[in-house]
Curated annotation (Swiss-Prot):
Membrane topology according to the record: Single-pass membrane protein
Lineage: Eukaryota, Fungi, Dikarya, Ascomycota, Pezizomycotina
Function as written in the Swiss-Prot or TrEMBL entry: Cytochrome P450 monooxygenase; part of the gene cluster that mediates the biosynthesis of echinulin family alkaloid. The pathway begins with the biosynthesis of the cyclic dipeptide cyclo-L-Trp-L-Ala (cyclo-TA) by the NRPS echPS via condensation of L-alanine and L-tryptophan. The prenyltransferase echPT1 then catalyzes the first prenylation step, a reverse prenylation reaction at C2, to yield preechinulin. Preechinulin is the substrate of the cytochrome P450 monooxygenase echP450 that catalyzes the formation of the double bond between C10 and C11 to produce neoechulin A.
Pfam family for this entry, one: p450
Protein name: Echilunin cytochrome P450 monooxygenase
Organism: Aspergillus ruber (strain CBS 135680)
Length: 534
């Protein structure tokens, strides 16, 4: 149960709490840091860095980089300087990758070199360094990833069908009576995770479990964003600032309070999952050999980190609704395929996937057309590497500009058009929404399976419309976004059952579905045991 809410408004207050005195110290640190950094760089750098726009002394390209939608500016620069480009952001060398070829050459073929993360002071302090998404590459990260993979292997995620079946049936039943699709998606995505991880279904959109966990994730996300802009950049560019006395760095105390709330929440959830009557992820990871030397708190973070990753599915489902409402002719083609393959007498099932190529294409094109993380998450090079005659130096921050990849006109002609047909014509088009290499999304297979069945059932069941498509599209083309993420703004859409027969079937299927997590997880466990026996 969520106990005590964190009392604060936004992470912006946290980063602004760096005092004027700390800023004075920062000036001295900047000059000293610059001196040693430049001396080290000139002595080691034998090859040139990749080309990029000229910056100013000390601050580099910081003033040229927009705070909102920087990926668009990066693409504009990459069109001029090439698919491997250097930016200097303060004292940080940042390498921007803007083509699938380059991203594959470096992030896939040399994955180990580029699987680390820049160590962000504020972000790590919020989790005590236990959040695997921010860990440096090494044994500790590999152990966390191993525990996560133990419940997210492709063959395992396919055995979670019983839970997806129940959750999507409830979703359809809810949308018969409300157009608040965002709340419905929020409940379903949270319930998928909470049931598997801790043995507790989320049955109502206003469940306090959702509000509490969402607040934690919001804080962490804002910390990550804040680390790359405004006052927060000082702490990241000059890490020595974190060692100043507490009266000069009040942000540290605030981070520590938030970290305590993370710790309590994750440990409480882990204990709930271990004590649940049915099989859960909590039980599975706790008994894994890799977990034996870990503390209870560290084990709890391996699952808690996955919750944040699961929340991206909410954004993706909202993108699906968006394109369904804005492009009714494409939605009609998807519905024609569903009617031909599935008919009206039953709901689409996971087993239908091989016969529904347009639905798969619909999902992939939606994610290409509106990437929810246009810059992905930053990586760090763990050693000097030569690539095409240029030096990618050790310690450089590496960003894959997913926006540039998805809007490459050579790869995706008419990139601003929503064209699922392109994926049907060429199923081998590069699809990189879930990242590259070892650091790609650990739950990609679970997410893809869940998104497919959710999309198929939504389009089978409903006609989805928006009252003002032109205004909605304009708003979404000019979003209020941050340094890395581009969340979908709120918009209205209506869900109308396609006919009375489908409406009756949805109501019947939900009425006879199991509602309690124990019965559902028993079915999941049977599937897993059956797979293991084979």
């Amino acid at each position: 149960m969520w106990d005590s809410p964190i009392i604060f408004t936004t992470m912006r207050e946290l980063v602004q709490s760096v005092s004027p005195a700390a800023l004075s110290w920062a000036v001295v640190a900047i000059y000293l840091g610059t001196f040693f950094w430049l001396r080290s760089r000139s002595s080691k750098q034998r090859l040139p860095l990749p080309p990029g726009p000229r910056g100013l002394p000390l601050i580099g390209n910081s003033l040229q980089t927009p705070a909102v939608n920087p990926w668009e500016k990066y693409k504009e620069w990459s069109d001029e300087y090439g698919p491997v480009m250097t930016l200097s952001l303060g004292l940080t060398t940042t390498i921007i990758l803007s083509s699938h070829q380059v991203a594959n050459d470096l992030m896939e073929k040399k994955s180990t070199i580029y699987s680390s993360r820049p160590q962000l002071v504020m972000f790590n302090r919020l989790s005590g360094g236990m959040n695997s998404s921010g860990m440096e590459y090494g044994k500790r990260w590999r152990d966390h990833r191993s525990l996560q993979a133990s419940v997210l292997r492709p063959w395992m995620t396919q055995r979670y069908t019983a839970l997806r079946d129940v959750e999507t049936k409830q979703l359809l039943a809810e949308l018969l009576n409300t157009d608040d699709f965002s709340s419905c998606f929020k409940r379903m995505v949270a319930s998928l995770f909470m049931t598997l991880a801790y043995g507790k279904r989320v049955q109502y959109p206003d469940d306090p479990e959702i509000r509490g966990m969402e607040e934690l994730v919001r804080v962490k996300s804002e910390a990550g964003e804040a680390s790359f802009r405004a006052t927060g950049q000082l702490v990241e560019y000059i890490p020595l600032l974190q060692y100043l006395p507490s009266f000069l760095t009040p942000w540290k105390e605030m981070c520590d309070r938030i970290c305590e709330q993370f710790n309590k929440t994750f440990v409480d959830r882990l204990r709930d999952g271990i004590n649940a009557p049915a099989w859960t992820w909590a039980k599975e990871v706790s008994k894994h050999k890799v977990a034996r030397p870990m503390s209870e708190l560290e084990i709890s973070y391996t699952l808690g980190t996955l919750y944040e990753a699961s929340l991206t599915s909410q954004q993706i489902l909202r993108i699906i609704v968006l394109v369904a409402a804005l492009y009714p002719e494409k939605t009609a083609k998807a519905q024609e395929e569903l009617d031909r393959v599935v008919g009206t007498g039953r709901l689409p099932a996971a087993a239908d996937a091989r016969n529904l190529p347009y639905i798969d294409a619909f999902v992939k094109e939606a994610l290409r057309w509106r990437p929810f993380a246009p810059l992905g998450a930053p990586r760090e090079s763990i050693r000097d590497v030569e690539y095409n005659g240029y030096l990618i130096p050790k310690g450089a921050t590496i960003l894959v500009n997913q926006w540039a990849l998805d809007y490459n006109e050579d790869m995706f002609p008419e990139p601003f058009s929503f064209l699922p047909e392109r994926w049907v014509a060429n199923p081998n088009l590069p699809f990189s929404t879930f990242g590259f290499g070892q650091r790609g999304c650990p739950g990609r297979y679970f997410a893809q399976d869940s998104l497919f069945i959710s999309t198929a059932r939504l389009l089978w069941a409903f006609n989805i419309r928006t009252a003002s498509p032109v205004e909605v599209e304009d708003m979404l083309r000019n979003p209020s976004a941050g340094a890395f993420l581009s969340p979908i703004p709120e918009f209205d859409a209506t869900f109308t059952a396609r006919d009375a027969q489908r409406k009756a079937l949805i109501e019947k299927e939900w009425e006879i579905s199991p509602k309690e997590s124990y019965a559902i997880l028993q079915e999941v466990e049977k599937e897993l045991i059956s797979e293991g026996a084979e």
